[in-house]
């Protein structure tokens, strides 16, 4: 019996020793699983670098498209204003290409690129999704309404400029309500209208060009409405271009 008891005691001690050794054996395996291999880290860095390059390419492409759209729209709308004898340029400027000052389309194209990139960035920052389904058909309708508002500002005859300004303001807000309806779009549109009107006032004051029958500090009082609706339109174009692009990579 003493031999049996000593044998049983030795077996139990050996079993406990084996159980105690198992966590120590599993620890190196867990450490090996948790520690990333050099090849995995290199692959992750390459993937991050590739996504960053793709994001930059999309950013450049969107900027170019917005610049071209803004420059073309400025050229067409300015021609409409000149034909209606609303905007007056000096004789030497009228003689230039397409009867427009050479600097107007590039400036408007640059502004369109900035505004078009700013709209989706602010939407992403505020976490405010667009309320409507984004599709190019809606964007084209928005552009058509904007061109109609600009054409109406030059063609329609009202008893006074106050009625014209109120009408265009209502149309501009209707454009925002129909195609945007976001707080960020409203705020950016108002900011764009204010800043662009100040810049136009500065240019007119320095004799770069002038308006016929100015009624508010040398410029037309309805001009902020045009800038507001133009900002909303370019913002919708920028939002549409921003769909389906990869997000900007973040380095942890």
Swiss-Prot record:
Among the Pfam families in the record, one is INSIG
Residue intervals annotated with topology Cytoplasmic: 1-59, 120-134, 180-184, 239-252
Q: Which InterPro entries match?
A: INSIG_fam (IPR025929)
Residues in the Extracellular compartment per record = 83-101, 158-160, 207-220
Membrane disposition: Multi-pass membrane protein
User: Which key words are in the record?
Assistant: Cholesterol metabolism, Endoplasmic reticulum, Lipid metabolism, Lipid-binding, Membrane, Steroid metabolism, Sterol metabolism, Transmembrane, Transmembrane helix
Q: Which GO BP terms apply?
A: cellular response to insulin stimulus; cholesterol biosynthetic process; SREBP signaling pathway; SREBP-SCAP complex retention in endoplasmic reticulum
Out of the domains of life, which is the source? Eukaryota
Q: Where is this motif: KxHxx?
A: 246-252
Principal cellular location given in the protein's record: endoplasmic reticulum
Residues covered by region (Disordered): 22-48
Identify one Gene Ontology CC term for this UniProt entry.
endoplasmic reticulum
What transmembrane ranges does the database entry give? 60-82, 102-119, 135-157, 161-179, 185-206, 221-238
Which residues does the annotation list for site: Required for the recognition of 25-hydroxycholesterol? 146
Q: What is the annotated localization of this protein?
A: Endoplasmic reticulum membrane
Which one of the record's GO molecular function terms can you name? Answer: oxysterol binding
What task does this protein carry out?
Oxysterol-binding protein that mediates feedback control of cholesterol synthesis by controlling both endoplasmic reticulum to Golgi transport of SCAP and degradation of HMGCR. Acts as a negative regulator of cholesterol biosynthesis by mediating the retention of the SCAP-SREBP complex in the endoplasmic reticulum, thereby blocking the processing of sterol regulatory element-binding proteins (SREBPs). Binds oxysterol, including 25-hydroxycholesterol, regulating interaction with SCAP and retention of the SCAP-SREBP complex in the endoplasmic reticulum.
Q: Quote the subunit structure annotation.
A: Interacts with SCAP; interaction is direct and only takes place in the presence of sterols; it prevents interaction between SCAP and the coat protein complex II (COPII). Associates with the SCAP-SREBP complex; association is mediated via its interaction with SCAP and only takes place in the presence of sterols.
Domain commentary: The KxHxx motif mediates association with the coatomer complex.
The Swiss-Prot or TrEMBL record describes its family as follows: Belongs to the INSIG family.
Q: What is this protein called?
A: Insulin-induced gene 1 protein
Top-level taxonomy: Eukaryota, Metazoa, Chordata, Craniata, Vertebrata
Q: Which gene encodes it?
A: INSIG1
């Amino acid at each position: 019996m003493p031999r049996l008891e000593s044998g049983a005691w030795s077996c139990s001690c050996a079993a406990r020793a084996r159980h105690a050794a198992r966590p120590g054996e599993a620890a190196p395996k867990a450490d090996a699983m948790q520690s990333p291999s050099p090849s995995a880290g290199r692959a992750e860095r390459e993937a991050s670098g590739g996504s960053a390059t793709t994001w930059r390419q999309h950013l450049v492409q969107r900027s170019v498209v917005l610049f071209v759209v803004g420059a073309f729209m400025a050229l067409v709308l300015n021609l409409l204003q000149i034909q209606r004898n609303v905007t007056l340029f000096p004789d030497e400027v009228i003689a230039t290409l397409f009867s427009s000052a050479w600097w107007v389309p590039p400036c408007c194209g640059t502004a369109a690129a900035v505004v078009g990139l700013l709209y989706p960035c602010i939407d992403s920052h505020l976490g405010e999704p667009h309320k409507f389904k984004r599709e190019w058909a809606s964007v084209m309708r928005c552009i058509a309404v904007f061109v109609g508002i600009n054409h109406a500002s030059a063609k329609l005859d009202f008893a006074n400029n106050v009625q014209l300004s109120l009408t265009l303001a209502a149309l501009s807000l209707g454009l925002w309500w129909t195609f945007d309806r976001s707080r960020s779009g409203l705020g950016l549109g108002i900011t764009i209208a204010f800043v662009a009107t100040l810049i136009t006032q500065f240019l007119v004051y320095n004799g770069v060009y002038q308006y016929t029958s100015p009624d508010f500090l040398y410029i037309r009082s309805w001009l902020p409405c045009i800038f507001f609706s133009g900002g909303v339109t370019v913002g919708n174009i920028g939002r549409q271009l921003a769909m389906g692009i990869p997000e900007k990579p973040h380095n942890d």
